[in-house]
Amino acid sequence: MKIRTSVKVICDKCKLIKRFGIIRVICVNPKHKQRQG
């Protein structure tokens, strides 16, 4: 999980999800996991 100020979709399988005001990226590739902080 990478915590970044700007969350970007890296590949086709990345999905942007907003949960409780936190923007996340969920992907098949665990390296692509991100969270805005």
Curated annotation (Swiss-Prot):
- What processes does the entry annotate via GO biological process terms? translation
Any Gene Ontology CC annotation: ribonucleoprotein complex
* Source organism of the structure: Treponema pallidum (strain Nichols)
Under Gene Ontology molecular function, one entry of this record is: structural constituent of ribosome
Q: Do you know which PROSITE patterns this protein is assigned to?
A: RIBOSOMAL_L36 (PS00828)
Q: Which UniProt keywords apply?
A: Ribonucleoprotein, Ribosomal protein
Q: Which InterPro entries match?
A: Ribosomal_bL36, Ribosomal_bL36_sp
Could you tell me what this protein is called? Large ribosomal subunit protein bL36
> What protein family does this chain belong to?
Belongs to the bacterial ribosomal protein bL36 family.
Q: State whether keyword Disulfide bond applies.
A: no
